């Protein structure tokens, strides 16, 4: 069986778990890992793999799995698609998916490559489950309740804000698809908490939700990477009222 040669682009939490997934996949082989530091301070688990700064240094890459922050996905995907390399990402800014699809669709077709976008759990697998539930009960309302748990995308977004030393963003469900964001941060020296908190609340990841920012002495003491979702569809199948379908999932979020 010919194996697909995959490159891991970015080696944070997502990259680490993609490595494990590829190691367990019988139809894939790891071409190497692309990270900003290259082979400098190479983690022990990467000892047997090529670790480079530029994907061009790897041989025979057929697909690049993008494990970068969401806001970097478009840049890397366009670069690799232009090289004829297929891409897979877990882009998770819901309001930006249509624009990203339009951009990467054009780039992929131009260079005869394939780009699979938003292949995480939400957006991703949850999107498929929602569609299935809506097919079962075509008339009705679907409620998506996340957590309580750590949101990886929101946590990464907070860490990128000036003045934030460490961060944890928790998603708290309040029911019927409404959520509260609880953000815990450690502050860098020389920054005012009120200004940093205001910047967090103004970020696109948080601007549409009730968000509370808390200053804590240690984010690590609060850290639990568990997350989950409850999808509920209440509606009508044919002429039968009060149909109720649920899907529950609990996961290790970075995986």
Predicted regions and their residues:
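Generic structural signal for hydrophobic
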Residues: 79-80, 108, 158
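Rossmann-fold NAD(P)-binding glycine/threonine-rich loop
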Residues: 91-115
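Gly/Ser/Thr-rich loops at beta-strand to alpha-helix junctions
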Residues: 12-14, 94-97, 118-126, 148-151, ...
